Design a protein with these regions (language model features):
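Active-site-adjacent loops and short helices of periplasmic peptidoglycan-processing enzymes
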Residues: 22-188, 196
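Domain-terminus/edge residues, biased toward the C-terminal soluble/receptor-binding domains
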Residues: 151-154, 162-167, 171-409, 413
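Proteins with a high burden of low-complexity, intrinsically disordered sequence enriched in S/T/G/P/A and R
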Residues: 6-9, 16, 28, 33, ...
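Secretory targeting and sorting signals
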Residues: 1-24, 381-398
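Basic side chains
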Residues: 2-3, 59, 66, 144, ...
Length: 414
């Protein structure tokens, strides 16, 4: 089976912040406008927890269990594959897409049925199609949870039915959703008000059970859940002005309460972050002297702009490390890479930008090199030393001649 690239090193570093106990201790409690017993909202690019309430408490999570079902499917199967409906028969009160015995459907459509309609029959078809059996798939779910560091999560089924061994926490759900959002197909589906399943024995169209999609333009995901034991659960996401949030509310008493709590989290969290330009394209960040051209300098500029999210009023959370030459020599073409800038945040390098020549520098002419060489302190010092030595030698020779002239002549006796 294939392994999809869903978790980059940079992303996992950010996710580690959401799971760190120290970070949890620093996170403020959620505002009074949020009534959910367990809630959390994070800023995705840094993993900063805007607020948290009982975020690590283990609770029943209903159909948000299907987020792990989705992740394993995206990592282990191709969207173009076709899976056969399982023998699982959901009861009339379970959410389902109406798969018929032996019906075959493309994985992409089963995923739409899983994420939009929350179909239990779609979940079982995916589980058995990926791992061969439900038990094998559940084992894989728990292995994946451990690798992601979801320390308050355990799965007992790929659907989300209530059970003592099927639970998670608000923080773990947010971590899982953040990983899933790196997948373009997932992001598109969960941000759709509806979806049409075109394969199978008949065409089916379903509305997204996350009714915030389409109602609030900035909401762009993710997944609802509901059982008697879980109450009403919503793992959500929202984006505004380049700031991406992911949230979770657990154990709310109704759909209305679930939605109200989620929107309250966003209204509270968005103003607490700002997007800054840490590095600005074509703005000089270093200068280098140009060899053989007295007083001339070359400006070095970033080749692109880097934007970062920081807590509002804390631009100093981002620092820059400039690595550039102090002296350059032509020929240098405009745009030639000569150095770099490292953007650091949270004690880590989060981006590296090339420093390029803002203008061209022609090769120095021989006359310039000669003139510069003649003006060099080393050359001047050398000439001065040579003149001094010559003067000393002349003085010594002159004194020697005078000494010889002054000596009396010696005559021999007869």
């Amino acid at each position: 089976m294939r392994r999809a690239a869903g978790t980059s090193a940079a992303l996992l570093a950010a996710l580690a912040l959401t799971a760190a106990p120290a970070q949890a201790a620093k996170a403020p409690d959620c505002p009074d406008s949020v009534k959910a017993p367990s809630a959390i909202v994070i800023e995705v690019s840094t993993g900063t927890v805007a607020c948290a309430r009982q975020a690590d408490k283990e609770r029943s999570i209903g159909s948000t269990t299907k987020l792990m079902t989705a992740l394993l499917t995206l990592e282990e199967a191709k969207l173009s594959q076709t899976f056969k409906a399982s023998s699982y028969r959901p009861s009339s009160i379970e959410s389902q897409i109406g798969l018929q015995p032996g019906e075959r459907m493309r994985v992409s459509d089963l995923m739409r049925g899983l994420l939009l309609e929350s179909g239990n029959d779609a979940a079982m078809a995916l589980a058995q199609g990926v791992s061969g059996s439900t038990k094998a798939f559940v084992r894989a779910m728990n292995r994946r949870a451990r690798r992601l560091g979801l320390s308050h999560t355990h799965y007992d089924n790929p659907i989300g039915l209530d059970g003592a061994k099927n639970y998670s926490s608000a923080r773990d759900l947010v971590t899982l959703a953040t990983v899933l959002r790196t997948n373009a197909f997932f992001k598109k589906v969960v941000d759709s008000p509806s979806g049409t399943l075109k394969t199978g024995v008949r065409q089916r169209t379903f509305r997204n059970r996350n009714t915030l999609i389409g109602k609030f333009p900035y909401v762009n995901g993710v997944k609802t859940g509901h059982t008697r034991g879980a109450g009403y659960v919503l793992v959500g996401s929202a984006s505004r002005n380049g700031i991406q949030l992911v949230s979770a509310v657990l154990a709310t008493p109704s759909e209305a309460a679930r939605d109200a709590d989620t929107i309250a989290l966003y209204k509270w969290a968005f103003p607490r972050f700002q997007r800054i330009r840490a590095v600005i394209e074509d703005r000089p960040m270093a200068t280098a002297q140009i060899r053989y051209r007295s007083g001339a300098e070359l400006k070095l500029v970033p080749d692109r702009t880097i934007r970062r999210i920081v807590p509002r009023g804390h631009r100093q959370a981002v620092s820059l490390k400039v690595d550039a030459p102090s002296v350059v020599e032509g020929p240098i073409r405009r745009g030639q890479r000569l150095g770099k800038v490292e953007v650091r945040q949270g004690g880590k390098t989060v981006a590296t930008v090339a420093l390029i020549a803002q203008s061209a520098v022609p090769a120095a002419k021989i006359a310039q090199k000669t003139k510069t060489a003649a003006q060099s302190p080393w050359v001047i010092g050398g000439v001065a030393s040579a003149l001094l030595l010559a003067t000393v030698l002349l003085a010594v020779r002159r004194r020697a001649r005078l000494t010889r002239r002054r000596r009396p002549r010696q005559t021999s006796a007869a």
